[in-house]
Swiss-Prot record:
Key word Lipoprotein present: no
GO CC annotation, single: cytoplasm
Keyword field contains GTP-binding: no
Residues annotated for ATP binding in this entry: G112, T113, D114, G115, K116, T117, T118
Reactions this protein catalyses: UDP-N-acetyl-alpha-D-muramoyl-L-alanine + D-glutamate + ATP = UDP-N-acetyl-alpha-D-muramoyl-L-alanyl-D-glutamate + ADP + phosphate + H(+)
Gene3D superfamilies: Mur ligase, C-terminal domain, Mur-like, catalytic domain, NAD(P)-binding Rossmann-like Domain
Gene name of this polypeptide: murD
Xref: HAMAP family: MurD
Protein's name in the database: UDP-N-acetylmuramoylalanine--D-glutamate ligase
Function (record text): Cell wall formation. Catalyzes the addition of glutamate to the nucleotide precursor UDP-N-acetylmuramoyl-L-alanine (UMA).
Amino acid sequence: MDVAGKKVTVLGGGKSGVAAALLLQQLGATVLLSEHGALSSEAMQRLQAAHIAYEANGHSEQIYSADFCVLSPGIPPTAPVVQQMEAHSIPLYSEIEVASCFCKARMVGITGTDGKTTTSTLIHTLCEADGKRHGYRSYSVGNSGIPFSSMVLAMQPNDVAVIELSSYQLERSISFHPQVSLITNITPDHLDRYGQNMQRYAEAKYRIFMNQQAGDTFIYNQDDSMLQAAFGASQIAVPCRSVAFGLEPLTNVQLDKRRVLVNGNMVVVRQNDGALQPIVAVDEVLNRAFRGKHNLSNVLAAVAVGEALGIGSEVMRQALTAFGGVEHRQELVATIDGVEWINDSKATNVNAMRQALEAVPAPMILIAGGRDKGNNYATVSHLIERKVCLLIATGESREKLASFFKGKVPVIAVPTIDEAVAIAHQQAKAGESVLFSPACASFDMFNNFEERGAFFKQCVRQVL
């Protein structure tokens, strides 16, 4: 991508938009950043320091004089400004697409509905450990928080860019070409963006491997029914080596693709000759701070990537045994009077809540709720009825939750998280857990799940 001398519009003034603007200006483009709403003071300071033009609280006609446009992931394809860009025949790219054009490092792309951040963090941990031995650096970028654009020019050819990708980021990634790609799972989420069409959502995820070539590797989860149907049965052609990981029992049809599995208590890699190479014992990597079948699946995914990158088994074992989990993902906040308090604010859909309910031992008090995303709680009803001694429903969706579970488990509905924590503290007994797993978006009261999780932890510490 040649950007020197080009006029570029960046739509959206969040972290990725500002990072893209700074990168493009550094590479010689003339940039206008345009934000429909307000810009943060930090964003304005960074843009002013770099002498980048910007506008906020609306879009002017200037934005349509660009050679191309960088579209922030939160702006949907149906937004009027996007449709106007297309009407003006202005090419639209994601921030990921732009950054990848200037990336010298090896790229690992990770997407999926759940498990992206934990798996990306595991992969980054493996690469950091291997990099210390072999003289390269690992960069964890993308949807996890640090924009790809802000780090890409520092990356060297032997480095590794571990890139977490949402479906939104992949939509406008036209030529993005990771050497290793991974899909953790695909379950219903964000369907409002995709016209309630699950296939359209999946196809956005599948963009991750579309530009891969014969020497590259695509990795998928055989335990996910949608992925197994698409790739295990070869319904969708993949242009590179395709390998799988999984926990469920194998069939002969699956065996030829499964590379990483559990044999007894051991995570193993199946070699080309069928021999099993041990990597790490399950009970060495799973613990109170990092537990559950879903996290074991995340470990298998990371090992599959490590194997594709040529990371040695001993390096992987040492790195995995030292891993302590990721903030806001079944994070053990504190143990108070024999009660474990667990922050799972990242559970923004019902499937993520299900994983937490399966991982945390009964009995528990469950705090759930927020901005509903068309949730169907029937898929977790059996777990809640069996394991939850009290459901505290909070946020905008509290009445929907309370109505659905009325008569199934004891339910209390309160407006706010701090009220929910106070009630849980009064009711919890030694040997129980308090699990905060909202199954909803955070936008009813918070800017993001991180802010929500931090508030929950603050509330917990106040009752210490």
